[in-house]
Curated annotation (Swiss-Prot):
UniProt site positions, description: Cis/trans isomerization of proline peptide bond: 227-228
Residues with the Phosphotyrosine modification: 138
Keywords annotated in UniProt: Activation of host caspases by virus, AIDS, Aspartyl protease, Capsid protein, DNA integration, DNA recombination, DNA-binding, DNA-directed DNA polymerase, Endonuclease, Eukaryotic host gene expression shutoff by virus, Eukaryotic host translation shutoff by virus, Host cell membrane, Host cytoplasm, Host endosome, Host gene expression shutoff by virus, Host membrane, Host nucleus, Host-virus interaction, Hydrolase, Lipid-binding, Lipoprotein, Magnesium, Membrane, Metal-binding, Modulation of host cell apoptosis by virus, Multifunctional enzyme, Myristate, Nuclease, Nucleotidyltransferase, Phosphoprotein, Protease, Repeat, RNA-binding, RNA-directed DNA polymerase, Transferase, Viral genome integration, Viral nucleoprotein, Viral penetration into host nucleus, Viral release from host cell, Virion, Virion maturation, Virus entry into host cell, Zinc, Zinc-finger
Lipid-linked residues (N-myristoyl glycine): 2
Annotated segments matching region Interaction with host CALM1: 8-43
Peptidase A2 domain boundaries: 513-582
Binding-site positions, Mg(2+) 3: 1216, 1268, 1304
Source organism of this protein record: Human immunodeficiency virus type 1 group M subtype A (isolate MAL) (HIV-1)
Protein name per Swiss-Prot or TrEMBL: Gag-Pol polyprotein
Ranges for region Interaction with Gp41: 7-31
Length: 1440
């Protein structure tokens, strides 16, 4: 039965069926396992034919072995099956799969040992690479001398990485893609990968933070060994070495290849992946548990969402496998879940998706119900049919195999791919437009009611690759209808395409049957049918194993009008099969009419239809020109005439070709382009001559009529319809559609590039010494062959292209230099851009300047020093293309300088891979930079300019780093490596900038070159507050409606200033306030702002800005000696900030609280905070906060809890147990503050209670616990715990709950909050902790207007301070004071010292309390004896 069953024959099949699947198991290998393995190999794009030999199996195992560690269970099963099959082929006697795997491992070990021995004997470089200690992956390889060398990461890899980030952003797929692309990379390579995506600053900052944390952890775990490093021994890497910031490439290679190795690349990669995981979690916050299939959601869409989320989950592969096996089925909708459970636990994903195809929604339910009802009423129907009531009632039929009598879900046959209704792949049954199942229709072989014809040679060039089954000598009637309609002579035999299953109606023994024409089957097998004559029993190998059949000989069968006599087997086959024994008799052949180019299938965007744009009127000469052009195109088969049945239309027009009287046809495909699917551009950019290697022989070819040589998808052609109108509507318009790729259609470039690559691939493989650069229809062909041999190869290439329908006209075949290619002029040893002529005009339009800038940009890649900034300034604003623009003096000067530069021709040289790349950058001023990339001084590979300003506020160092990144990225694309940079900036300046500013942990290798003007930082901010300098608290406020605002400052020295502003914003006022502070301060100043916006601008140390106020701030900063800038959060009661905020807010901030309403509502939905907490946290008026609480249905149960209780000693706690949902919750309340601690305990025992009290005492200062008389509180365990923790235990009055009033009321409050959040948590213990959090930190009120959490901390802190103060007071009372009053020179006293300050003391003399300056007081210790007289206050007792 087919090719897959013929992998083993004879004795090998017997041996195969004796091998057990598991050691000691009952199940053995069967033929179905080979069929499964063949299908799996096809799925993984491996040739199933390899299974037929031992060598083939060995090749498959080599391919699969590398994927075993990370692969799915299916891959492992496939490997096991192939390993067992290999043993059968090699006649190795094995009893089960495990024994087969052991044998394979033994063979591989022996083979490896032999290889290593051979390598040791020969000492060959190639053999050395097989050593396990050497990385066989890039970028560290071993050269012929045995040295470890670094092979740079390829530009293709880097381009792939850039595209991954651009396409996927930071979705879960990024992590496996990064892991695969960075296999074996060094830290330098990894940093290169990070650098080229450095534009994603937020993500890179997160990544940097993770790397820094991991590096710090590494340093802590791996401390530096004391003493010097022994000679010849490498130092141990630090965290920053692993991150590549403080280590050289050679050091990294040394660590990675030492014995034992330190895999710094893998360690750094692991850190990066940790960071990427955090980024992915931020971008994809959905949990796998939340992925559930919607009631009508297709199973395929659900699976896509499931696996996308699964990739983002942080779990091991085993856990992910478990999630796939369990959650995928568990979270499916009920309809799919029923089917999936019926499939059993071992079902593959493909089987699940096939089984669940078309499931879901009302149509599916109706169908299932109809099938169930038809099954239930079968017997009744049979009785009624006998009576003649229901003649010809339809029996139920299986969607899967087409047989009657059972349902698809009960079908034993293998699940059929494609739609269960029409048999076609590419859609599900629920989306099928056919009314009945196609694979049971009599005319399936000829779906359009006509036969396929052999295409003519011209048509074949433009038709899709097709595979057809032809039955020779059939009757004419089947094909003539279609032939007559199209007016084409057809062959007389039917042709059956293989785009669908080739099912035809055959007549056997006078009965009609649907049967599959199977050229892979030896025998003809039919399901149960009554045939005349004798039969013999027989066993045949089928798809599901062996089946028993009856063999009838010499049976007449009629297929497509042809008769044959042969053997027919009758048995329980899932599908009727006509095998080769009958097909050969009727002359049936399998034909492969290969069209030169396979068409690429194209579709419209989902839910869209083709364009229906009316044709606009055309002049007579344009209509005539278009008619002639279309006649020629029709003759060449490029377009096809169509009738009115095509409803689509796209407008067409004509323009005259440049410098010619000939016309050119243009079709406006703008509308079709909007509706066509998106395409992936196969080529990311154009090749650059600087990246070409110098070649002896070069040829440049052009492909003629490039697009018109590639066929368009047949199903899509109808959408390209256009109409050529007639003059004065004399006749209906002539309608055409394209057979080939149209000019101007969005899909043409991508499809052409893809087709061209496929066509050139065999030539490139056959001739590796020839380099072909391909961009659209331009081909550059270079080689180091002699010119004669080279030209022979060129002719071979032209013939190869011609076979595929591509012509290379002699007119554009360039054999001698200079070669004109892609806008460049190529010479044997140099290149330049094609000559550029700058126009000289009296007046310039916008269009003229745009073209001029384009030419200058093109020239800048080899002419150094080109500038366009002033010319670009002329184009600012929305201007029409024809508007006249006067040139400014600066623009005229810039244009004149550019003319001078372009006067002398400049050439670039070609790339030499053996030499280093060097990039040198010079500053041109006004934010413009020029650079040269060379390998030898004064021989530039290419030049360029950089003038892009990425932000409104910048400085030269920042622009220089952006230019470096741009040049590095450009170099990676062209040469696959970064150059060494020579920059006009001193190391000290660079370091000062980079230590403070953000970096992606990678700075390219560079050196200082003294090329004026040098880059410098014009000012530097201090990192610590300046001692002795005045501190300015600055703030600004603006009203959004009136645009009025205020800016001002207050200082720590009592100064303050406020200015009123008009037409301003909050951000401008914040900057204006900083400017005021800088204006009014001395040479050194501390400034404190609450604006992150202003802080961000100034901390980046800009030296130029588009904002006038920022430029004024920069001028002030340059004049200062020292400036310290700090930030504090706004509205948090911070001294000076609060004062200046009140100062600038008066009369301005009226509606600013509206900003906080949304955030407050969001927080209330999560925590159900009370109105005081929201008013405080979000700056809301009480009425607004109360309204939010009033609109919440969960907060309206019993009103809001009353707050405010007696201020008791801060050491007293009340404890109680309460019950909820059948569980016990123990609650402890801090009486003074209302702060609670609670948790669910397993039992109300003394042991659990004692443990809770000890936990409480470990967190807070507990002096007294007040409890009721419950047995758990009066237990010995609790008494022991209280004794140990020095806690006094008090008991309430029996049967009087009021003695436990505080904790009782808190129990009610806690249960109320639990009720509000219960649905957010799965378990009660989680809800309890959520409720504790909300009560302690999200509810404010009572003493001080604090939350309970703030209040307990404040009370404990106050208690400590009070005790400390009390100690100080006690000490102070041991002193006496003698003092002089006013101008009286007589000392008085002794008085009692109450308080001692910096400038004065407070004393009590008799009953009077006085304040005396320190200079007029003498403080002495009281020794218990009274001083004798007023003048006896001698110095020995003096305190100061």
């Amino acid at each position: 039965m087919g090719a897959r069953a013929s992998v083993l024959s004879g004795g090998k099949l017997d041996a195969w069926e004796k091998i057990r699947l598991r050691p000691g198991g009952k199940k053995k290998y069967r033929l179905k396992h080979l069929v499964w393995a063949s299908r799996e190999l096809e799925r993984f794009a491996l040739n199933p034919g390899l299974l037929e030999t031992g060598e083939g199996c060995q090749q498959i195992m080599e391919q699969l072995q590398s994927t075993l560690k990370t692969g799915s269970e299916e891959i492992k099963s496939l490997y096991n099956t192939v390993a067992t099959l290999y043993c059968v082929h090699q006649r190795i006697d094995v009893k089960d799969t495990k024994e087969a795997l052991d044998k394979i491992e033994e063979i591989q070990n022996k083979s490896r040992q032999k290889t290593q021995q051979a390598a040791a004997a020969q000492q060959a470089a190639a053999a050395t690479k097989n050593s396990s200690s050497v990385s066989q992956n890039y970028p560290i390889v071993q050269n012929a001398q045995g040295q470890m060398i670094h092979q740079a990461i390829s530009p293709r890899t880097l381009n792939a990485w850039v595209k991954v980030i651009e396409e996927k952003a930071f979705s879960p797929e990024v992590i496996p893609m990064f892991s695969a692309l960075s296999e074996g990379a060094t830290p330098q390579d990894l940093n290169m990968m990070l650098n080229i995506v450095g534009g994603h600053q937020a993500a890179m900052q997160m990544l940097k933070d993770t790397i820094n944390e991991e590096a710090a952890d590494w340093d802590r775990v791996h401390p530096v060994h004391a003493g010097p490093i022994p000679p010849g021994q490498m130092r141990e890497p630090r965290g920053s070495d692993i991150a590549g910031t403080t280590s050289t490439l050679q050091e990294q290679i040394g660590w990675m290849t030492s014995n034992p190795p330190i895999p710094v690349g893998d360690i750094y990669k692991r850190w990066i992946i940790l960071g990427l995981n955090k980024i992915v979690r931020m971008y994809s916050p959905v949990s796998i548990l939340d992925i559930r299939q919607g009631p009508k959601e297709p199973f395929r869409d659900y699976v896509d969402r499931f696996f996308k989320t699964l990739r983002a989950e942080q779990a091991t592969q085993e856990v992910k496998n478990w999630m796939t096996e369990t959650l995928l089925v568990q979270n499916a909708n009920p309809d799919c879940k029923t089917i999936l459970k019926a499939l059993g636990p071992g079902a593959t994903l493909e089987e699940m998706m096939t089984a669940c195809q078309g499931v879901g929604g009302p149509s599916h339910k109706a169908r299932v119900l109809a099938e169930a009802m038809s099954q239930a009423t079968n017997s009744t129907a049979a009785i009624m049919m006998q009576r003649g009531n229901f003649k010809g009632q339809k029996r139920i039929k299986c969607f899967n195999c087409g047989k009657e009598g059972h349902l698809a879900r009960n079908c034993r046959a293998p699940r059929k791919k494609g739609c269960w209704k029409c048999g076609k792949e590419g859609h599900q049954m629920k989306d099928c437009t056919e009314r009945q199942a196609n694979f049971l229709r009599e005319n399936l072989a000829f779906p359009q009611g006509k036969a396929r014809e052999f295409p003519s040679e011209q048509t074949r060039a433009n038709s899709p690759t097709s595979r057809e089954l032809r039955v020779w000598g059939g009757d004419k009637t089947l094909s003539e209808t279609g032939a007559e309609r199209q007016g084409i002579v057809s062959f007389s035999f039917p042709q059956i395409t293989l785009w669908q299953r080739p099912v035809v109606t055959v007549r056997v023994g006078g009965q009609l049957k649907e049967a599959l024409l199977d050229t892979g089957a030896d025998d003809t097998v039919l399901e149960e049918i009554n045939l005349p004559g004798k039969w013999k029993p027989k066993m045949i190998g089928g798809i599901g194993g062996f089946i028993k059949v009856r063999q009838y000989d010499q049976i007449l069968i009629e297929i497509c009008g042809k008769k044959a006599i042969g053997t027919i087997l009758v048995g329980p086959t899932p599908v009727n099969i006509i095998g080769r024994n009958m097909l050969t008799q009727i002359g049936c052949t399998l034909n492969f009419p290969i069209s030169p180019i396979e068409t690429v299938p194209v579709k419209l965007k989902p839910g869209m239809d083709g364009p229906r744009v009316k044709q606009w009127p055309l002049t007579e000469e344009k209509i005539k020109a278009l008619t002639e052009i279309c006649k020629d195109m029709e003759k060449e088969g490029k377009i096809l005439k169509i009738g009115p049945e095509n409803p689509y239309n796209t407008p067409v027009f004509a323009i005259k070709k440049k410098d010619s009287t000939k016309w050119r046809k243009l079709v406006n495909f703008r509308e079709l382009n909007k509706r066509t699917q998106d395409f992936w551009e196969v080529q990311l950019g154009i090749p650059h001559p600087a990246g070409l290697k110098k070649k002896k022989s070069v040829t440049v070819l052009d492909v003629g009529d490039a697009y018109f040589s590639v066929p368009l998808d047949e199903d899509f052609r109808k959408y390209t319809a256009f109409t050529i109108p007639s003059i004065n509507n004399e006749t209906p318009g002539i309608r055409y559609q394209y057979n080939v790729l149209p000019q101007g259609w969005k899909g043409s470039p991508a499809i052409f590039q893809s087709s061209m690559t496929k066509i050139l691939e065999p030539f490139r493989t056959k001739n590796p010494e020839i380099v072909i650069y391909q961009y659209m229809d331009d081909l550059y062909v270079g080689s180091d062959l002699e010119i004669g041999q080279h030209r022979t190869k060129i002719e071979e290439l032209r013939e190869h292209l011609l076979k595929w329908g591509f012509t290379t006209p002699d007119k554009k075949h360039q054999k001698e230099p200079p070669f004109l290619w892609m806008g460049y002029e190529l010479h044997p040893d140099k290149w330049t851009v094609q000559p550029i002529q700058l126009p000289d005009k009296e007046s310039w339009t916008v269009n003229d300047i745009q073209k001029l800038v384009g030419k200058l940009n093109w020239a800048s890649q080899i002419y150094p020093g080109i500038k366009v900034k002033q010319l670009c300034k002329l184009l600012r604003g929305a201007k029409a293309l024809t508007d006249i623009v006067p040139l400014t003096a600066e623009a005229e000067l810039e244009l004149a300088e550019n003319r001078e530069i372009l006067k002398e021709p400049v050439h670039g040289v070609y790339y030499d891979p053996s030499k280093d790349l060097i990039a040198e950058i010079q500053k041109q001023g006004q934010g413009q930079w020029t650079y040269q990339i060379y390998q030898e001084q004064y021989k530039n590979l290419k030049t360029g300019k950089y003038a892009r300003i990425k932000s409104a506020h910048t400085n030269d160092v920042k622009q220089l780093t952006e230019a470096v990144q741009k040049i590095a990225q450009e170099s990676i694309v062209i040469w696959g490596k970064t150059p060494k940079f020579r920059l006009p900036i001193q190391k000290e300046t660079w370091e000062a900038w980079w230590t403070e500013y953000w970096q992606a942990t990678w700075i390219p290798e560079w050196e200082f070159v003294n090329t004026p003007p040098l880059v410098k930082l014009w000012y530097q901010l201090e990192t610590e507050p300046i001692v002795g300098a005045e501190t300015f608290y600055v703030d600004g406020a603006a009203n959004r409606e009136t645009k009025k605002g205020k800016a001002g400052y207050v200082t720590d020295r009592g100064r303050q200033k406020v200015v009123s502003l008009t037409e301003t914003t909050n951000q401008k006022t914040e900057l204006q306030a900083i400017h005021l502070a800088l204006q009014d301060s001395g040479s050194e100043v501390n400034i404190v702002t609450d604006s992150q916006y202003a802080l961000g601008i100034i901390q980046a140390q800009p030296d130029k800005s588009e904002s006038e106020i920022v430029n004024q701030i920069i001028e002030q900063l340059i004049q200062k000696d020292k400036v310290y800038l700090s930030w504090v959060p706004a509205h948090k009661g911070i001294g000076g900030n609060e004062q200046v905020d009140k100062l600038v807010s008066s009369g301005i901030r009226k509606v600013l609280f509206l900003d906080g309403i949304d955030k407050a509502q969001e927080e209330h939905e999560k925590y159900h905070s009370n109105w005081r907490a929201m008013a405080s946290d979000f700056n809301l008026p009480p009425i607004v906060a109360k309204e939010i609480v009033a609109s919440c249905d969960k907060c309206q149960l019993k009103g809001e809890a009353m707050h405010g209780q007696v201020d008791c000693s801060p050491g007293i706690w009340q404890l109680d147990c309460t019950h909820l949902e059948g569980k016990i919750i123990i609650v402890a309340v801090h009486v003074a503050s209302g702060y609670i601690e609670a948790e669910v305990i397993p039992a109300e025992t003394g042991q659990e209670t004692a443990y809770f009290i000890l936990k409480l005492a470990g967190r807070w200062p507990v002096k007294v616990v007040h409890t009721d008389n419950g047995s758990n509180f009066t237990s010995a365990a609790v008494k022991a715990a209280c004794w140990w923790a020095n806690i006094k235990q008090e008991f309430g009055i029996p049967y009087n709950p009021q003695s436990q009033g505080v904790v009782e009321s808190m129990n009610k409050e806690l249960k109320k909050i639990i009720g509000q959040v219960r649905e957010q948590a799965e378990h009660l213990k989680t809800a309890v902790q959520m409720a504790v959090f909300i009560h302690n930190f999200k509810r404010k009120g009572g003493i001080g207007g604090y939350s309970a959490g703030e209040r307990i901390i404040d009370m404990i802190a106050t208690d400590i301070q009070t005790k400390e103060l009390q100690k100080q007071i006690t000490k102070i009372q041991n002193f006496r004071v003698y003092y002089r009053d006013n101008r009286d020179p007589i000392w008085k006293g002794p008085a009692k010292l109450l308080w001692k300050g910096e400038g004065a003391v407070v004393i009590q003399d008799n009953s009077d309390i006085k304040v005396v300056p320190r200079r007029k007081a003498k403080i002495i210790r009281d020794y218990g004896k009274q001083m004798a007289g007023d003048d006896c206050v001698a110095g020995g007792q003096d305190e100061d």
